[in-house]
Design a protein with these regions (language model features):
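N-terminal loops that bind phosphate or other acidic moieties
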Residues: 1-211
Length: 211
């Protein structure tokens, strides 16, 4: 498989919907220690609706705009901070694929680059500040490296997940700078950031399509 057609996007994101349903309680528990305790609910609700939102906004000749429109609708479903960050990633990633009919090797890298830009733009955050970005940015860097090495679409996706895992691990040594996590900064040492974990699960969910 070297490309994903626009009409296959709902199935691609079904893996994300499934993984967040499975990890809902785990993410809520992590978030209860460092935040509001609703992260798992937000992720399962938002990404749970995304496959249907993609279907409803499907344009088989424009994969990018399909994602942009679905991302906008997703933002309305989960208007919380993390919901907004995740849906902004979908929208900005979609903008990178405007007028594309399919997602191949280059398009996957471009989508991830857009996802990073969406998080940065909406969250006003940078790498190293213990956020979702600390999983997605190293994932994008790993994807780019795999692409440059001539890896297949499946291999690029696998590299993306590995990059995110390393990013999540690195958050254990980072100090939180945003939200309620700042109050619990002393407890953060040695514990992965829950937002970064959500980013890893997003990518692992996408990876299920290739299994």
């Amino acid at each position: 498989m070297e490309e994903i057609l626009a009409k296959e996007l709902p199935e691609l994101f079904k893996g994300v919907s499934d993984i967040f349903a499975e990890k809902k309680d785990e993410l809520c528990e992590m978030d209860a220690n460092m935040g509001d305790g609703d992260l798992g609910l937000t992720m399962s609700k938002g990404f749970g609706t995304l496959p249907d939102l993609i279907t409803e906004n499907m344009d088989e000749n424009n994969l990018g705009m399909t994602l942009v429109k679905a991302g906008m609708k997703m933002a309305a479903v989960v208007p919380s901070t993390m919901g907004t960050l995740m849906s902004s990633g979908v929208m900005e990633g979609g903008k990178k694929l405007k007028d594309k009919k399919s997602m191949g090797r280059q398009e996957l890298v471009d989508f991830l680059e857009g996802y990073v830009e969406g998080i940065k733009k909406r969250g006003k955050c940078e790498v190293g500040e213990r956020t979702l970005l600390d999983a997605i940015h190293p994932a994008f860097e790993a994807a780019k490296e795999a692409f440059d090495s001539g890896k297949s679409l499946k291999e690029i996706m696998e590299a993306t997940v590995e990059g995110a895992k390393k990013g999540v691990e690195a958050t254990k040594e980072m100090t939180p700078k945003y939200g309620k996590a700042v109050v619990f900064a002393a407890k953060a040492k040695g514990i992965p950031d829950q937002g970064a974990m959500a980013g890893l699960y997003l990518l692992e969910g996408l990876g299920r399509y290739f299994v």
